[in-house]
């Protein structure tokens, strides 16, 4: 069983002026286990995307270490699939060629990679769209292709950076439910970033709330709304339940309180 371990991690970026620095993350400690769906929530600039970029191996920490399966993360790897806010698909390839592209780069034989891509496209409900070009798909369908592509290399972990931010409300809810189905069927580690409190509560088995810069994990909640959905298939009933509403208000109060404190410290007035 592979775990993602983030141990005493801080990140400092160069500032705008000579000798200036900006601390993006401060002393982050987090363990994500197989079968965890961890969602990071916080105000803009709290370091959520920086934390995901560290896990993906796109950047290195200024201090601390990140381990996957006990091995240090030294860069991007096939053991981590990434889904971005913008789908990053290749427009000159059709759906199935996009889905199998990572395996092609690894030199996997065509018949084998095609079989894997077919299975993963079926997992996200695109079994009838193999030959469609990307421009022929809706935004939600394009994100489904991105999810299928991330799954084809059988990563231990899926990293998702606000993948539904540009989708309409109905499509967003559909993709949320799809993600929970994929999570249930694969038991992979998920690390998901969002600005939506409702989305975070619905998806997360564990929610981490981060403070504004420097980003710190200030609150952690173990949740079961996702499992309740998988049992009942009634998202509306769950999102309108008293405990869901109470948790939403609790988290909103934390985030708004953090934003006000950060603005006051920066000398910004909120009207």
Swiss-Prot record:
Catalysed reaction equations from the record: taurine(out) + ATP + H2O = taurine(in) + ADP + phosphate + H(+)
Major localisation: membrane
InterPro entries xref list: AAA+_ATPase (IPR003593), ABC_transporter-like_ATP-bd (IPR003439), ABC_transporter-like_CS (IPR017871), ABC_transporter_ATP-bind (IPR050166), P-loop_NTPase (IPR027417)
Subcellular location(s) per record: Cell inner membrane
Keywords annotated in UniProt: ATP-binding, Cell inner membrane, Cell membrane, Membrane, Nucleotide-binding, Translocase, Transport
Taxonomy, superkingdom: Bacteria
GO molecular function, one term: ATP hydrolysis activity
Membrane topology qualifier: Peripheral membrane protein
Residues that coordinate or bind ATP: 42-49
GO cellular component: plasma membrane
Pfam families in the cross-refs: ABC_tran
UniProt entry tagged with the keyword Membrane: yes
Residues in ABC transporter domain copies: 6-237
EC number annotated for this UniProt entry: 7.6.2.7
Top enzyme class: translocase
SMART domains listed in its UniProt record: AAA
Subunit structure: The complex is composed of two ATP-binding proteins (TauB), two transmembrane proteins (TauC) and a solute-binding protein (TauA).
The protein's role, per its UniProt record: Part of the ABC transporter complex TauABC involved in taurine import. Responsible for energy coupling to the transport system.
The family this protein is said to belong to: Belongs to the ABC transporter superfamily. Taurine importer (TC 3.A.1.17.1) family.
Protein name: Taurine import ATP-binding protein TauB 2
Organism of this sequence: Paraburkholderia xenovorans (strain LB400)
């Amino acid at each position: 069983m592979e775990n993602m371990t983030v141990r005493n991690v801080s990140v400092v970026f160069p500032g705008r002026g000579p000798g200036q620095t900006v601390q993006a993350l401060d002393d982050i400690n987090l363990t994500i286990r197989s079968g965890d769906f961890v969602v990071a929530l916080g105000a803009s600039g709290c370091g959520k995307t920086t934390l995901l970029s560290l896990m993906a191996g796109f950047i290195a920490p200024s201090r601390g270490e990140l381990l996957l399966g006990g091995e240090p993360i030294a860069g991007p790897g096939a053991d981590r699939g990434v889904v971005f806010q913008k789908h990053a698909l290749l427009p000159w390839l059709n759906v199935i060629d996009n889905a199998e592209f990572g395996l092609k780069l690894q030199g996997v034989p065509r018949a084998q990679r095609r079989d894997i891509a077919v299975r993963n496209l079926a997992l996200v409900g695109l079994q009838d769209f193999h030959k469609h070009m990307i421009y022929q798909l809706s935004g939600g369908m394009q994100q489904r292709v991105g999810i299928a592509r991330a799954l084809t290399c059988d990563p231990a972990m899926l990293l998702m950076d606000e993948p539904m931010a540009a989708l309409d409300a109905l499509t967003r809810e559909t993709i949320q439910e799809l993600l929970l189905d994929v999570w249930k069927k694969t038991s992979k580690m998920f690390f998901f970033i969002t600005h939506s409190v409702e989305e975070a509560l619905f998806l997360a088995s564990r929610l981490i709330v981060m403070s504004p810069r420097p980003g710190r994990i200030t609150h952690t909640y173990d949740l079961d709304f996702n499992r309740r959905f998988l049992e009942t298939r009634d998202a509306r009933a769950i999102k309108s339940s008293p405990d869901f509403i109470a948790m939403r208000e609790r988290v909103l109060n934390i985030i708004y309180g953090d934003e006000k404190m950060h603005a006051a410290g920066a000398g910004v007035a909120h009207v």
